[in-house]
Amino acid sequence: MAKVIGIDMGTTNSCVAVMDGKNAKVIENAEGARTTPSIIAFTDGDERLAGQPAKRQAVTNPEGTLFAVKRLIGRRYDDPMVTKDKDLVPYKIVKGDNGDAWVEVHGKKYSPSQISAMILQKMKETAESYLGETVTQAVITVPAYFNDAQRQATKDAGKIAGLEVLRIINEPTAAALAYGLDKSEGKTIAVYDLGGGTFDVSVLEIGDGVFEVKSTNGDTFLGGEDFDIRLVEYLVAEFKKESGIDLKNDKLALQRLKEAAEKAKIELSSSQQTEINLPFITADQTGPKHLAIKLSRAKFESLVDDLVQRTVEPCKAALKDAGLKAGEIDEVVLVGGMTRMPKIQEVVKAFFGKEPHKGVNPDEVVAMGAAIQGGVLQGDVKDVLLLDVTPLSLGIETLGGVFTRLIERNTTIPTKKSQTFSTAEDNQSAVTIRVFQGEREMAADNKLLGQFDLVGIPPAPRGVPQIEVTFDIDANGIVNVSAKDKGTGKEHQIRIQASGGLSDADIEKMVKDAEANAEADKKRRESVEAKNQAESLVHSTEKSLAEYGDKVSADDKKAIEDAIAALKTSLEGEDAEDIKAKTQALAEVSMKLGQAMYEAAQAAEGAGAEGGEQASSSKDDVVDADYEEIDDNKKSS
């Protein structure tokens, strides 16, 4: 039975795990690392890179390197958070045909789901390489505070990557699964998850294999990226103060600054001070300029203090919704790379009144939890029950633009809820059902998930028709809505697809594109491998020909030289099949050369053995003489 993999598709890094017996195992990628940068790059040569190779070339290709794209997933182009992000990243964020935020590279537009699919493909390949079999099913994690549009877009990304997404699971819940799988005693825990782009806090009750989420809260635009940006802004300001040069519009310099900021942030988690050194960051008429700035941990903490404090309010809200006080939490589990920052650990300790638990790897625990959930769905992991919640209230717009909730936030999912509404005007023959998600009292202030019309209502005075609206949330947190006229029995049902979102046709096209790209990538890899093999054979044959060319006939020597020339010509092109054929031809004609080398080696060995015997016998004589001499000495003594 094929394995179900667990993927933590993070803003900054991604991780993949699989159940190995009773334990979840994190799988190393081709570069030997347990996490993979969530970065995709398109080079000038139209080559696509994923993970570490993409990150390595970011400085020289800022506009073609896409990072932190998860922050755009499921968002509209006119979203204030997208507007903010546009000024902070070197690549182009553009308006998609459906009104969503997309990205553009080399004149081609991509949806965030497509870019995320490329990252998922890399994780899929990592798992397949380890397992030695094709992987088709996965559990993918998302921030707990993701809305329906963001969850749907993540599921779309999985489909584009060629994966059947068995379950979308919340990141803090996945972390709790990995943390509590082997714990039998009942506990109330809080999972504080501060990653690269998002922040979540969830309160859970765990014990005897039951993981029940009591509440969740968070901020989908707060994470390590914001800490990096804050540090980059400081470095730009300091450099301007020193040199009078503003680096704000220099994309190459900004990319170098971003890398340096990320490195400095990591170093300051274990040391009190670091130095940011970037030679030749820019130049003016007086010559090249270098950036060298010392940064203390205290200074960095003061720069990001408001970001750290922004995590406190969601913690308060989560406790309030769970009906608990901070002192009633037995354990606080830290998840996400940013929780290594000492200041964050201090704030968590101060708020919850206890040392946070650091026994899990914050970068890997979410993927491990996803793998465990995969094991549960496959039947490999027994006696585990996961009860998650919907993070935001769901409802519809009613008379006067009011948001009428049908399902309150932190309701356990899956769930179903119906409510009966009526018409607002006499003889109204149709109603528009507008579905929203959020916590504000007016519908317009919340997130519009989608809308549909129920038509064919018989003429009647206002307030008479009975229209039943039903909300159904599945275990992935994805919403289905139906409206039914009780009088006529007419019904309209939709799976909520955000007013933007990807249509089935869009997804189908992107799946085909992804498959075509995978085929092109495979051909490119085959071509590179064929070239490497061919070049290696040319080099070794030329070397052997120089050494043993006089041992073969003139005709054989010419045939080998001609085959080398033909292969060199083929190497100038990109035709992998032709290169393979010419490599094979050279291998065959150079067999005579190999035979001559073998015979020469045998002859040398034979001569060596004969000489060795003579040397050995003369050596024996010497030893005997020595022995006799020593003997004589002994006798004379």
UniProtKB/Swiss-Prot annotation:
Residues 516-542, 601-637 are annotated as: Disordered. PROSITE patterns: HSP70_2, HSP70_3. Disulfide bonds: none annotated. This is Chaperone protein DnaK. Pfam families: HSP70. The modification Phosphothreonine is found at residue 198. Keywords: ATP-binding, Chaperone, Nucleotide-binding, Phosphoprotein, Stress response. Residues 516-529 have a biased composition (Basic and acidic residues). Induction: By stress conditions e.g. heat shock. It comes from the Bacteria. Residues 601-617 have a biased composition (Low complexity). It comes from Brucella melitensis biotype 1 (strain ATCC 23456 / CCUG 17765 / NCTC 10094 / 16M). Acts as a chaperone. GO terms for molecular function: ATP binding; ATP-dependent protein folding chaperone; unfolded protein binding. InterPro entries: ATPase_NBD, Chaperone_DnaK, Heat_shock_70_CS, HSP70_C_sf, HSP70_peptide-bd_sf, Hsp_70_fam.
